[in-house]
Amino acid sequence: MKFFRSVGEVFGYSPFRSLAQHARMCGRAVGLLQQQFEALRRGNYEEVEELREEIDELEHHADQIKEEIRGNVTKSLMLPVDRHDLLEFLKVQDDILNNCEHVGHMVTFRKVSAPEDVWDEFLVLLSKLMEIVNNYEEMVERIMQLVETSFSKKEVNRALEYVPIIEQLEHECDLIQIGLHTKLFNLENSNPLDIQLMVTWVVHLGYVANAAARASDRFRIMILGR
């Protein structure tokens, strides 16, 4: 006879608390990227490198949590959501951190010179990214209330209210990216290598926003597919 365990019977282990902790790290990573770009603007490359190391450490810690969840969410563990949906959600959420790490490395490749209005636009983009991940974190934090209330309709609706907000913010992020690309491609007195690298930054910052939007959709699938 197949033996099933409840979530609370695995030495108190809860994949949902770990999922929420992993989501908080996404917000922390975007916050570190903001600091990196502020340091870039000031030309403080030592701080840029230190922040890259912080992002690397954060991503490594997040990977440990990810592997902990994968190792504990076995087929014999009884869950209130579909196991495959939970692991797919975790995979996409992890893309937020992976893309933050990529950007954190790319800004150390070269000392870039850019006009002040370009740095202004990068910080506007990062501010919008921070808004996205703040809403994303709040959404994932709701998962504990969902579990505690046995996924009551009221709590499900409250949690899923964040999904269209995140999607709208991701669209606004796209518009900022378009404006920033236009500005970069019209720089006449800048080094072409600097422009090329900054364009790559814009693209990968967009990947962070896209990952958050995709993860919010996977969250919705996980909650509604139970």
UniProtKB/Swiss-Prot annotation:
InterPro entries: DUF47, PhoU-like_sf, Put_Phosphate_transp_reg
Family: Belongs to the UPF0111 family.
Positions of disulphide bridges: none
Source organism of the structure: Archaeoglobus fulgidus (strain ATCC 49558 / DSM 4304 / JCM 9628 / NBRC 100126 / VC-16)
Name the UniProt record assigns to this protein: UPF0111 protein AF_1799
